[in-house]
Amino acid sequence: MLRAALPALLLPLLGLAAAAVADCPSSTWIQFQDSCYIFLQEAIKVESIEDVRNQCTDHGADMISIHNEEENAFILDTLKKQWKGPDDILLGMFYDTDDASFKWFDNSNMTFDKWTDQDDDEDLVDTCAFLHIKTGEWKKGNCEVSSVEGTLCKTAIPYKRKYLSDNHILISALVIASTVILTVLGAIIWFLYKKHSDSRFTTVFSTAPQSPYNEDCVLVVGEENEYPVQFD
């Protein structure tokens, strides 16, 4: 009975633990490192990259930016296995003519790139970047796209959750762990008490004092006393 009851006791607590460490806006987002990602699979017609970007900003995010090889690999793997995205994904990048460099829309630093070999002599005005899913490389292309088959968005874990949630998560984990331990101990104590009580009741019943005489003996004795034997 105790073993069968434990899963029912633990499942709600495990659900609370999962909720305590969830940092992304909803279950449709996927967390990796310090960011959350969502792939909007709806195909839309666009007039500029800003239309694509608006798809992300409407969800409180921005177009994808990539900052290391691990993140690039994560996006490729997730697009192939879970999101089922198109062959090329538009990156949240634009060419800044002021200093002749590519920059991310989310204003993060350009710390990593994976450009494929291309001729850089061409005019880069109105040039955007695409992630090629089959190779994982980035390639340059015209920003004047007429449609996109999906938009990949990214948002950072909120500051409050990222930097202040460690203590909250620790406290929540301790509370949950304590609750689990107390629940299990309570169930064990109850089980042992119930078992001991049943055993004690059985023992008391089986060892109750029994009369040395049965009813027949009592009757016989009574009869003997009622008619005493007379001696001459």
Swiss-Prot record:
Annotated Gene Ontology cellular component terms: cell cortex; filopodium; membrane; microvillus
Subcellular location: Membrane; Cell projection, Filopodium; Cytoplasm, Cell cortex; Cell projection, Microvillus
Bilayer topology: Single-pass type I membrane protein
Main localization of the protein described in the UniProt heading: membrane
Superkingdom of this protein's organism: Eukaryota
Function comment: Potential multifunctional C-type lectin receptor that may play roles in endocytosis and phagocytosis as well as in cell adhesion and migration.
UniProt-recorded name of the protein: CD302 antigen
